[in-house]
Amino acid sequence: MVNKNLKVAVLGAGAMGCLFGGLLAEKGLSVVLIDVWKDHVDEINNKGLKMMGHGGDRTVKIKATTDPKTLQPVDAIIIMCKATALEKALTNSKNIIGDKTMLMSFQNGIGHEEIMQNIAGKDKVLGGSTTQASSIQGPGIIQNHASLPSWIGEYDGGHSQRVKDLAETFTSHGLETIAEEDIKRRKWMKLFALTAIGPLSAIFDLHHTDLYISNKNQKMSRNLGKEIILETREVAKADGVDVSEKDCLEMFNRIVDSRQTNKSSMAFDVLTVSYTHLRAHET
């Protein structure tokens, strides 16, 4: 059932947080963006969020803040901050978590949900995954690189009415979302793709089409990509998710064939001498 009165907070208003929040707000949901980048937040509040690319260039009116303490509890929290900032950001935002608030992370990688469960409680945390792509063009400006689906599901698996209702609500408000029975497997399938793109893209400073199609060393690149995916498969098995070698290689071939021209976030992190997502899982 679609809930037109759903109140949403997006924790982390970078490229993807602004994309998700902007799409939902554009279609009428109550959405607030939370981020520490004051210039970005001020630009959004003063001039609106400028969204370019897929769907056409337009400006969306949406609320943004650097201080979650000023907010009331919401129905759903979409987490899009850097993995390295997750624990601190969510702890600082505990006041917006109500008795029935649902939290979901669309961050890349595995392990975010366990951090969220420790802070908010296991019963409130869903899993999420997305194939959307976006980039920041400047304060208050994003570029939408794709109009592709996202998935949410109970983190331990199975069906639930709350997931079905939330997926329908997001979809009816501009963010195509599918209720997924096995969200953990879905997240691992996304991670297979990321491990084949992110590290090599960062090392060679190439976007993914140049990496696998249009460079003279593409054979070497493809062999490395396949080896990385198959090694990732072994890690997934240790986490209880068994994906066949055939499915892994089919995933890799889809990556090569998709001819995306955006660089990985890891490549941008290396270029700007920022911490990559990997730092969040160091011990």
State where each predicted segment sits.
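C-terminal substrate-binding/catalytic lobe of Rossmann-fold NAD(P)-dependent oxidoreductases
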Residues: 221-228, 233-275
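Nucleotide donor/acceptor-binding cores
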Residues: 6-7, 75, 148
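NAD(P)+-binding Rossmann beta1-loop-alpha1 motif at the extreme N-terminus of oxidoreductases
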Residues: 2-53
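Active-site-proximal catalytic alpha-helix in oxidoreductases
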Residues: 184-211, 220-233, 258-261
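Rossmann-fold dinucleotide-binding core
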Residues: 106-190, 196
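Rossmann-like NAD(P)(H) cofactor-binding subdomain of soluble oxidoreductases
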Residues: 34, 58-141
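Helix-loop-beta segment of a Rossmann-like dinucleotide-binding subdomain
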Residues: 97, 141-151, 204-214, 262-271
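Conserved small/polar residues in nucleotide/adenosyl-binding loops
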Residues: 276-283
